[in-house]
Amino acid sequence: MLRARPRLRVLGPGDVDAVTRLIEQDPVTHVFVDYRVRLTRLEPRWLGGEVWGYDEGGELVSVCHAAANLAPVLSTPDSIDAYAGRALAQGRRCGSILGRDHEVAALWERLAGEWGPARSVRPRQPFMVLDKPPLVEASADVRRVRADEVDILYPACVAMYTEELGVSPETAGGASLYRARVAQLVSRGLAFAHIEHNEVLFKAELGPITPHASQLQSVWVDPRHRGQGLAAERVAAVCEAALRDGAPVVSLYVNEHNVSARRTYERVGFTETCRFATILF
């Protein structure tokens, strides 16, 4: 009896159930790709790219999101080889590679010769989760940002993005697109902030949301208010909202060198479960 050869293929709407079953092996860690699959139903016009699948013995064993972000999921050495081959054939279309540290490292090893040098390589990013009420009292000052406060929030979002990624989101005419993204987050109730006298002292967002997890991202504290131990209470407020809205787990990943942020998340009750890595272009 002949066995099906391992192969890479571009997935489509008919593969949604198989991808969902695969990701359910670790849905919290892979919340980003899970969210994208659920949101787009693997329709090419909504993906803005592709999702690749790798079959062994006729069974889907790994996937790789290949759009604005290149994100391997549950990959093996053979599937990494296949993903790298397709990525090299297409040329770089993504702004980053992200995922479990060992998977990203293996993929980047194969791509660096053609795609490098990267603008930034972040090889060790603790992936942390909170699956219980926060350990610190939530700040009453943090709330969802209103639609009429987008102008107030926007400068803080630009500052956070620039500080975190080393480049302004407004570069190369990107201001209108980034502003639209901020407005969309506000309209969906995913942007939180502590605002006083029309100034943002703290902000955070909830990014990918699935039935399994909600991901905390874009956390920022006004530099004038850092080092005062206030961030934990504000992060706790966002986490409380996420858990109250039905997410069983809140996740995040943070740069290893950002010791103050890691301590803040630990105070809130987050624990590390694995390591991520990110390659930025």
List where the protein language model places each region:
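Short amphipathic alpha-helix that is part of the acyltransferase structural core
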Residues: 1-33, 133-171
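Conserved donor-binding loop and adjoining core beta-sheet/short helix segment
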Residues: 6-11, 21-27, 34-96, 200-214
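Acyl-donor-binding surface of acyltransferase catalytic domains
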Residues: 56-61, 65-140, 279
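Acetyl-CoA-dependent GNAT
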Residues: 57-58, 65-70, 133, 165-166, ...
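Conserved beta-strand-loop-alpha-helix junction that forms the acyl-donor binding cleft
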Residues: 98-104, 223, 252-262, 279-281
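Conserved active-site alpha-helix within GNAT-family acetyltransferase domains
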Residues: 102-120, 232, 256-274
